[in-house]
Amino acid sequence: MPKSIEIFLRSLGGYLFMLVDVGKDIKSHGVSLRETSRHIIVIGVQSLPIVLITAVFTGMVLAIQTAYGLQRFGAKNYVGNLVGLALARELGPVLTAVMVCGRVGAGIAAEISSMMVTEQVDAIRALGGDPIRRLVSPRIVAGMISLPLLTGLAVVVGIAGGMAIAVTELSLIHISEPTRPY
């Protein structure tokens, strides 16, 4: 087996074991409300501006590009349906995850790495504490709470941005029928 695949599989296994440890810890001990709320602010509230700015411009660009593509077929009135579906199903969750991971992931990695270098994680273990419980579980729970809320807001703001462009620049004020589920 090539070395790179072996490294990937070992890393993936380590992540899965860590998630199992986090699940066991949350089930048996719960999480610290103070730490979790602090990380919700860091992960969710402080990521809100970059996520919403990205979403509104994505909705605007998506509306313009969709309108120009559909204009050739005389289906310009379906811009709203397509923008809404694209943002709700694909772009909203993906762009939110990319923005949050880019902003928060580097900070969390740097913070925990700094704690490893200064031996703070070893100090937690030496004092009888569990680093998973103190450092990892609150961050994972905060992410599980923050990311769906950020995604919902991103979808709504992206659709509003697309609607603003559709009404002001594309002169689309037609209210279309709801899209049928597939």
Model-derived regions, located:
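Short, membrane-interfacial amphipathic segments enriched in basic
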Residues: 1-34
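Membrane-interface helix starts
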Residues: 27-53
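Transmembrane helix-loop junctions in multipass membrane proteins, especially transporters and channels
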Residues: 29, 63, 67-71, 106, ...
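Selective transmembrane-helix segments that form parts of the transport pathway or gating/packing helices
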Residues: 44, 48, 52, 91, ...
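Active-site cofactor/substrate anionic-group-binding motifs, chiefly glycine-
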Residues: 44-95, 99
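Mid-bilayer segments of alpha-helical transmembrane spans in multi-pass integral membrane proteins
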Residues: 60, 86-111, 131, 148-164
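Short cytoplasmic-facing helical segments at TM-TM junctions of multi-pass membrane proteins
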Residues: 112-140
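Single conserved hydrophobic/aromatic residue that forms the stacking wall/gate
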Residues: 173-182
